[in-house]
């Protein structure tokens, strides 16, 4: 989140854009991400569909948190930028698209949730900057992190040669810095005094190669998949447990003090939200660490302490 903000503000400052808008979009863009990343999102989406509330989308969930649950009264420009921030979908050129209206914004939400799985562009140039910063932020960082935790070897020869040359990578400890430096400068050079935010042709092609490498060696790694059954079990356990607690109105359940009874949650939300939606929002708002804490809390008996006299 902070890295995306720094990258986007750096680009926005040189291009003389609205840095406050860029900062607001950046800080809210990943609020909807769930425990255990993309695999966690996949499982939660399946559970949501099974319970009749449709697929889960982390960008739509960010809007759910900020505009529905907490009713933060953010501007339409900020909400639109957060909704359309998806930098994982690579685009060589990003140009503001659509009209700035609440009806248009709602149509974008429905398009994302629909069968065609559309991925709309932001309506502001600042939103486009954040989206391209999202692409820049994770590309080199994910690879360097994967090397640091021994997910892949410390061997630059396994990285596509074109990427090594273009990003001028000298050793694995400088991967992220090298990628950031080249991509930020390229975006600025190709976007200055333009009505869109763009990469050059060579850089855009290298990004696609880099992403393909990361997908095969990191995101779809067999080492990461080995715990997938455990994560699925944890998600299913939590979802079913809290659904049952809401059915029984079990006020001792964590979902009541953590979610349902919070005084800063919108009264409209409390009145109009279904049980599966409440459970979805509760789980989606957890960090990995709290997710694990809650799972242990509801599955492991409390230890009875012996008293010595």
Where are the model-predicted features located?
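Short secondary-structure transition/capping motifs
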Residues: 1, 32-33, 51-55
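Active-site alpha-helix of zinc metalloproteases
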Residues: 24-25
């Amino acid at each position: 989140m902070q890295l995306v903000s720094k990258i986007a503000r750096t680009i926005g400052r040189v291009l003389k854009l609205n840095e406050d808008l860029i900062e607001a979009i950046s800080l809210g863009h990943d609020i909807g991400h769930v425990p255990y990343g993309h695999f966690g999102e996949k499982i939660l989406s399946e559970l949501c569909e099974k319970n009749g509330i449709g697929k889960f989308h982390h960008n739509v969930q960010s809007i759910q948190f900020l505009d529905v649950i907490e009713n933060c009264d953010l501007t339409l420009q900020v909400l639109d930028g957060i909704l359309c921030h998806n930098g994982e979908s690579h685009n060589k050129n990003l140009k503001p698209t659509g009209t700035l209206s609440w009806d248009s914004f709602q149509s974008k939400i429905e398009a994302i949730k629909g069968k065609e799985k559309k991925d709309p562009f932001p309506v502001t140039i600042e939103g486009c900057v954040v989206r391209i910063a999202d692409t820049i932020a994770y590309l080199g960082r994910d690879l360097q992190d994967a090397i640091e935790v021994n997910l892949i070897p410390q061997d630059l020869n396994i990285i596509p040669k074109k990427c090594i040359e273009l990003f001028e990578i000298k050793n694995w400890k400088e991967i992220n810095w090298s990628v950031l430096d080249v991509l930020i400068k390229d975006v600025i050079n190709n976007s200055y005094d333009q009505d869109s935010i763009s990469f050059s042709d060579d850089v855009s092609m290298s990004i696609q190669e880099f992403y393909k490498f990361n997908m095969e060696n990191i995101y779809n790694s067999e080492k990461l998949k080995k715990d997938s059954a455990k994560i699925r079990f944890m998600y299913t356990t939590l979802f079913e447990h809290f659904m049952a607690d809401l059915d029984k109105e079990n006020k001792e359940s964590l979902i009541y003090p953590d979610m349902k009874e919070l005084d800063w949650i919108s009264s409209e939300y409390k009145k109009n939200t279904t049980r599966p939606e409440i459970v979805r929002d509760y789980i989606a708002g957890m960090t990995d660490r709290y997710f694990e804490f809650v799972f242990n809390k509801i599955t492991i008996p409390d230890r009875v302490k012996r008293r010595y006299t």
